[in-house]
């Protein structure tokens, strides 16, 4: 629904009088930003800023929260988010990593440890009982794409409905920062790059019935750093999809391999 002052500031008065709660906690932000909340709580992925006692508002500006007077379609629009790593990190260490990649690879592409992905949302549940139900969340991976001449972190959302499937990719920022999140070999010549070079496809999420899960949760997700290749929409990334056997059921079953629609917004494939 539409968000207003009381969505964050928790005032009992719907007309918002003079008294509002200005002491916001990360829990307020997490009420909407569920993946970021899951990074810290459900999956307990460390973050150097969080570990240092910082919270959301330590980095994000009032303009990020309240807007700057311009209308944006998405927080991914240029100018919509004011916060940058360089606001605090005015200089970087002199080393081979920064000298080699500093102009073409974003800070987050290397320093984010993992993204959290809500995989395979069962849209029948959203339509019929107004409840979001995903197959589950995957972690220990991150996707790479191009954006404005830089290699950036990406993520995706996948949805099924009545036998149809959609995958939408876009840039993403996870709050899972670490100093030594990757090594050279994590990107260069990793198993996903090699599979794409050899076969023209990357196995991202694959149905494996040999898992024998009693609830049919037999999807296996890739691990590590996964490039979004130029043929991502032509079978270059394998996604298997499942659906619930019925709305309200806890049982899942295989539906198909491959999405009916692929989208990549605010970025281009990694080349």
Residue ranges and their predicted role:
Residues 1-14, 21-271:
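C-type cytochrome heme-c attachment and multiheme electron-transfer modules
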